[in-house]
Amino acid sequence: MAAAAAIRGVRGKLGLREIRIHLCQRSPGSQGVRDFIEKRYVELKKANPDLPILIRECSDVQPKLWARYAFGQEKNVSLNNFSADQVTRALENVLSSKA
């Protein structure tokens, strides 16, 4: 998977410390995020066993991707109404840019 390779490639250079994904368990706007987790989380975690990848479910929350870098800097991207492939691209975009 491209996202797994992207994380391995940039983690050290950018000081990536953590990835968090916030989503709702049942809202239509979070469906693509749920699909992404179901299809790609295991591969992503296997490729990056030392990187915390946190999945946070909460009712009625807007789906969002957070990347935390060194010195507490964070970057976030809304994932509302994204497909699983769009979530993958959003993850790759966040990882390819510095906080």
Swiss-Prot record:
Keywords of this entry: Acetylation, Disulfide bond, Electron transport, Membrane, Mitochondrion, Mitochondrion inner membrane, Respiratory chain, Transport
Residues that bear N-acetylalanine: A2
Gene3D superfamilies, per the entry: Glutaredoxin (3.40.30.10)
Cysteine pairs bridged by disulfides in the record: C24-C58
PTM sites of type N6-acetyllysine: K64, K75
Modification sites for N6-succinyllysine: K64
Assembly behavior: Complex I is composed of 45 different subunits.
Family listed: Belongs to the complex I NDUFA2 subunit family.
General function of this protein: Accessory subunit of the mitochondrial membrane respiratory chain NADH dehydrogenase (Complex I), that is believed not to be involved in catalysis. Complex I functions in the transfer of electrons from NADH to the respiratory chain. The immediate electron acceptor for the enzyme is believed to be ubiquinone.
Protein name: NADH dehydrogenase [ubiquinone] 1 alpha subcomplex subunit 2
